[in-house]
């Protein structure tokens, strides 16, 4: 499953034993895989400031999740024919999202734990806001390009009445630069081809004999040329319409046709060069990604290999700027999101369990959807004794307190936050 439960309990002896009981029961019943989730010690500040931060982090959490989902959807749209390999391009620091979450380690260089919590939150908020601003401008430019290209493509795929003729006609099909003569294009139903050949010369005076030629056709009819004197154009149109032959308003302009063809070529080239897709992950250790060391301490299984032993290495090739930007900044936004989750656990744990700071965070990955109800029952049973501590801290679980974001629906004896990696659902 791509679902995780991030919980915490007080770090005293009694509750550490409760965590071990939880791990034992969930392991034997095959309910979940549990991993310690390391969160650094931060400067706590006042409890009032923590309540405010709790509210701000809740909003930032929602914003970050929405942002990475939008970015994931943008990757889908850009990759077009390679949509089946989208997940290979949705990585965090060069590894798949599940590996990053289960091997999470706080980035001290980017978000120093020695800074006040409010500064760390502000850094995360500004980073995500900038990514969203850039996402809007880049995807807007892509949408304009795509729309312009689709409009030109529609003109090339319609019927003979509406489609562009620049890719059908040629200079040789027309009498040009004549003071007296002009070549018209006439759409003739397929059932009337024979009638057209027999009557077009007599539809009006001054029609050049044997001047008609079929130059294109679709399922409904054909496009014929006919040359006549300019002064009988209107008369010819009227007589043609009476016979269900439609004169297409088109006059050969070599410069305009050249411009239209060049525009199509330019748009196709822009889309290919600027937004070309690749299903290969960015090369590990490139300037784009900082090497990320990962470390994990699984409960009851200290010999489990670390993520570094399974790092993926592949070299990106043929990536256009938009896809490359999306991959890099999706990674940055996702990493920021998991850091926000860690901060929420820290802040909520201090508000719940009090000072001095002493709690243990654990990441649970339910093995299957059908087991989540049983897993919740196990957790509620193991940590039932925390109700008294929580009640003393939050006064009344049935009353929503600004910042704590608790209610009857989502209140549990332990700190709990949900992480869902189903970003494309």
Swiss-Prot record:
InterPro entries: ATPase_V1-cplx_csu (IPR004907), Vac_ATP_synth_c_sf (IPR036132). It comes from the Eukaryota. One of its GO terms (molecular function) is proton-transporting ATPase activity, rotational mechanism. Keywords: Hydrogen ion transport, Ion transport, Transport. Residues 295-318 are annotated as: Disordered. It holds the Pfam family V-ATPase_C. The keyword Disulfide bond does not apply. Lung, kidney and testis. Expressed in both bronchiolar and alveolar lung epithelial cells. Isoform 1 is predominantly expressed in the lung while isoform 2 is strongly expressed in the kidney and testis. One of its GO terms (cellular component) is vacuolar proton-transporting V-type ATPase, V1 domain. GO terms for biological process: positive regulation of Wnt signaling pathway. V-ATPase is a heteromultimeric enzyme made up of two complexes: the ATP-hydrolytic V1 complex and the proton translocation V0 complex. The V1 complex consists of three catalytic AB heterodimers that form a heterohexamer, three peripheral stalks each consisting of EG heterodimers, one central rotor including subunits D and F, and the regulatory subunits C and H. The proton translocation complex V0 consists of the proton transport subunit a, a ring of proteolipid subunits c9c'', rotary subunit d, subunits e and f, and the accessory subunits ATP6AP1/Ac45 and ATP6AP2/PRR. Subunit of the V1 complex of vacuolar(H+)-ATPase (V-ATPase), a multisubunit enzyme composed of a peripheral complex (V1) that hydrolyzes ATP and a membrane integral complex (V0) that translocates protons. V-ATPase is responsible for acidifying and maintaining the pH of intracellular compartments and in some cell types, is targeted to the plasma membrane, where it is responsible for acidifying the extracellular environment. Subunit C is necessary for the assembly of the catalytic sector of the enzyme and is likely to have a specific function in its catalytic activity. Belongs to the V-ATPase C subunit family. PANTHER family: V-TYPE PROTON ATPASE SUBUNIT C, V-TYPE PROTON ATPASE SUBUNIT C 2. This is V-type proton ATPase subunit C 2. It comes from Rattus norvegicus.
């Amino acid at each position: 499953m791509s679902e995780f439960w991030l919980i915490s309990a007080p770090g005293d002896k009694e509750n550490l034993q409760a965590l071990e009981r939880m791990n034992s029961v969930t392991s034997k019943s095959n309910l979940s895989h549990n991993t310690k989730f390391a969160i650094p010690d931060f400067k706590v500040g006042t409890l009032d400031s923590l309540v405010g931060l709790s509210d701000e982090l809740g909003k930032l959490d929602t914003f970050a999740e929405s942002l990475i989902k939008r970015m994931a959807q943008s990757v889908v749209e850009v990759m077009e024919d390679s949509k089946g390999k989208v997940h290979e391009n949705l990585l965090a620091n060069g590894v798949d999202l599940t590996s990053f979450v289960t091997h999470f380690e706080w980035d001290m260089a980017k978000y120093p734990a020695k800074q006040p919590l409010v500064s760390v939150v502000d850094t995360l908020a500004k980073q995500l806001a900038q990514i969203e601003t850039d996402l809007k401008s880049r995807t807007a430019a892509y949408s304009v390009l795509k729309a312009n290209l689709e409009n030109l493509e529609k003109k090339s795929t319609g019927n003979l009445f509406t489609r562009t003729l620049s890719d059908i006609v040629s200079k040789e099909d027309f009498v040009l630069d004549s003071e007296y003569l002009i070549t018209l294009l006439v759409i003739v139903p397929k059932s009337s081809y024979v009638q057209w050949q027999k009557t077009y010369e007599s539809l009006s005076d001054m029609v050049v004999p044997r001047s008609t030629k079929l130059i294109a056709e679709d399922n409904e009819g054909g496009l014929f040329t006919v040359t006549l004197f300019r002064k009988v154009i209107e008369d010819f149109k009227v007589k043609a319409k009476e016979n269900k032959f439609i004169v297409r308003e088109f006059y050969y302009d070599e410069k305009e046709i050249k411009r239209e063809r060049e525009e199509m070529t330019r748009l196709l080239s822009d889309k290919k060069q600027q937004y070309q897709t690749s299903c290969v992950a960015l090369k590990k250790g490139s300037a784009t990604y900082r090497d990320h060391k990962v470390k994990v301490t699984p409960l009851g299984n200290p010999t489990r290999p670390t993520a570094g032993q399974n790092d993926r290495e592949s070299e990106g090739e043929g990536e256009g700027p938009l896809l490359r930007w999306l991959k890099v900044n999706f990674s940055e936004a996702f990493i920021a999101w998991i850091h926000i989750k860690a901060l929420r656990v820290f802040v909520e744990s201090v508000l719940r369990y009090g000072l001095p700071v002493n709690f243990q965070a654990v990441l649970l990955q339910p093995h299957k959807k059908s087991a989540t109800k049983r897993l919740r029952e196990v957790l509620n049973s193991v940590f039932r004794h925390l109700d008294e501590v929580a009640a003393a801290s939050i006064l009344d679980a049935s009353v929503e307190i600004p910042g704590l974001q608790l209610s009857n629906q989502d209140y549990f004896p332990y700190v709990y936050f949900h992480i869902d990696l189903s970003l494309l659902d």
